[in-house]
Amino acid sequence: MSYLKQAVADGVDGFHYDTVKHIELPGEYGSNFWNVILNNGSEFQYGEILQDDVSNDAGFGKLMSITASNYAQKIRSALKDRRISAGNLMNYQVSGVDAANLVLWVESHDNYANDDQESTWMNDSDIRLGWAMITARAKGTTLFFSRPVGDGNGTQFPGQSQIGDAGSNLYKDAIVTAGNKFHNAMVVESEYLHNPGGNEQVAMIERSTKGAVIVNLVDGDKQINSETNLADGIYTDKVSGRQFNVSNGRITGSVPSRSAVVLYDDKASQAAQVSIDGYKEADNSISKATEVTLKAKNADSTTYKLGNGQEVAYKMVIKSLLVKGLKLVNQLL
């Protein structure tokens, strides 16, 4: 524990806990681990859970963020089949856990490096498209696995890099970086998932009226003429530079072959905003202790306070336990 606290003091933001499902939960026989080890002062912590029938996702999800490994499996299946319904894309495949507490990936080191080579078949194009879909979502923290140089297409370890070398530069790809920026810009916006025109080869993730990501899973450009919630205007794709027109609730444009377009208004996304997940602003108090997530976007500084207590500064996202009967105030400075 002293090591973790020292790491935080030295600038570490958080911790990954491997194979957490094999460590007992508080309340189980002889357990005093998680309620001690998680109290280290870090900003973000998550536990790796490879889901199965006995992984107790809900139990661990009450303590920390956890990985949604079954959702990643669904994403990889969609990439292989080159189609996904909006319903399947929407379902995080985890029960009893707030989606804000999920860690999302296209693949993990286990999927790639284990003997069954569950994800090794994917190429860079597959990873780009999968990443575009998960980073466009309103909930969850996305995690990118950096493969060895020369990876994929069934080749696990091509020998072009050694232990300690930098991995693949795919994380710098235009779709990957545009997806990351979109994820941050849309942090407080609601989502609407659909297949334009009912075509499951194309997935569209809209974020309120502010932005959208459209993913074309197949070869050949896809012409889009679909309903949308986006505000009227002309949107320029952050990846290809193509333009999309939105007028009277419809969007038109062309999505490149096996690619994704990322659409949003940079200026509109730069306004400072705050929000609270798990708390209704119309309520004057919380009737019982409740975990919520505070979010801030494009703010130089933000604070929260409980009741008449002291204001506490925080960065971007923080989880807080509300004490019964106290009103929560989340504000920009």
Task: Place the predicted regions along the sequence by residue.
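Active-site-proximal helices and loops of the catalytic beta/alpha 8
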Residues: S2-S269
